[in-house]
Amino acid sequence: PYRIPLMAGSSQRTLPTVSEGALGYWALTPNIDLWGMWRSRVFLWTDSTTGIRDEGVYNSQTGKYDKHRARSFLAASWHDDTSRYSLGGSVQKDVSNQIQSILEKSIPLDPNYTLKGELLGFYAQLEGLSRNTSQPNETALVSGQLTWNAPWGSVFGSGGYLRHAMNGAVVDTDIGYPFSLSLDRNREGMQSWQLGVNYRLTPQFTLTFAPIVTRGYESSKRDVRIEGAGILGGMNYRVSEGPLQGMNFFLAADKGREKRDGSALGDRLNYWDVKMSIQYDFMLK
């Protein structure tokens, strides 16, 4: 129903997130929700070549999860007509302890205009067998977005900062608001900034244009600096009637460039990416 801290899959990729285990929900009051989840098996974007796998300890030498360790989640969310404040945490023996907060506030400007602010905070600490003497064992991220909504669409600005990058097979830190198909926002000491506009041609058809810049480092050694810039363009069409009602078509193209002086990948990297997804939304009651 909304973005539940740590439990909700946040990847912008065409792959879904799948959890196998048990999920619990309790509406403590009309304004307070409690969520709990125990997960034994999972499928994330990092598992695209292997499929659904056991939760556990990642072995970087073999690329497999050698030891099975279930992961437990707990989250709470308070909301009213214009706000939602959520906090969640997870515990996984020999892997990590994580905490995430999501704050959302909408301010009506007049009957047709609103201003919405969103702020995400995240902290993770590796535990037990996942700790590494040569790499950072903890990280923090802060990211936010401000959106001005109008009858014709919206204008938004977003930013994010990641202290330390981590292997996505262990801890997913690619969760900030700035979005690019090409440029990496998930690197050491990485800042990312984006401005964009969504223009609604019809109630069903929307165009998006959003340039982005990034600044960070290639690794925890901080010996190769990354300076990136890119432009994202997209279109979205939602079927509102007929037998395909609820189907959503999304097409995006992205052009980016990075300066990485001294990198083994090259001093100048050029990217061109295209993404298309067809999604059908429905609800079982």
Predicted region positions:
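Transmembrane beta-strands of outer-membrane beta-barrel pores
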Residues: 1-5, 38-42, 80, 89-93, ...
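A C-terminal functional module that forms or caps the active site or interfaces directly
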Residues: 191, 198, 206-240, 246-250
